[in-house]
Amino acid sequence: MARTTSTAGIALLKKFEGCRLKAYKALPTEKYYTIGYGHSGADVKSGMTITLAQAEAMLKNDLKNFEKSVNNYVLVGMTQNMFDALVSFSYNCGGTVLKGSTLLKKLNKKNYVDAAEQFMKWNKSGGKVIPGLTERRAKERALFLRGYCDKPTVQVSKTTAKASYVRWLQWKLGVKIDGVWGDKTAAAIRAKRKKLGWPKTSGYICTIKFIKVLDK
């Protein structure tokens, strides 16, 4: 069954799009006027005004196209958070951008964390970094990873860590990301501790202090 954007996903999109009830052009060179929650097209005329209810209806209708694109382009399993992040990204950048992106290529190879890192490459306009886009991409990336690759907030061990915590550790340690705390992950932890000059351990426990070091 095709996914649709969750309430949380829509809230994120609305936060960054904002809502304007009178038609405008962000740049004089833009072909079309924009109105509502970033709705743009030949149907938006100069001087046009709408109600909030109409803006909501436009958003709902526009979302269908981007949801369809994400559902069609992504060929592997994904979480609702991943879907929501991709819809927000597509709504802002365009569905065709996602289709030809390295982000999608990595995602369709199940390289989820590598795919997430691609969000930050789309923070420019006219070749210049835009702070608002940087913030939006960071929020989309965080949403994409939420529940799949999460930074531990407490000390974790092989027997207590959730798979999402293990993936985060593996990502930061630069080892294969599979969510399984096996020998290679333990060896990477031991190697990192040795490099830091810390006491030896089994490699199957990570303290908060160690987690903070990995997050730098």
Per-region residue spans from a language model:
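Cell-envelope/ECM-targeting effectors and their regulatory/trafficking segments
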Residues: 110-113, 117, 131, 135-216
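Acidic, aromatic-lined catalytic clefts of primarily extracellular/periplasmic carbohydrate-active enzymes
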Residues: 1-91, 97-153
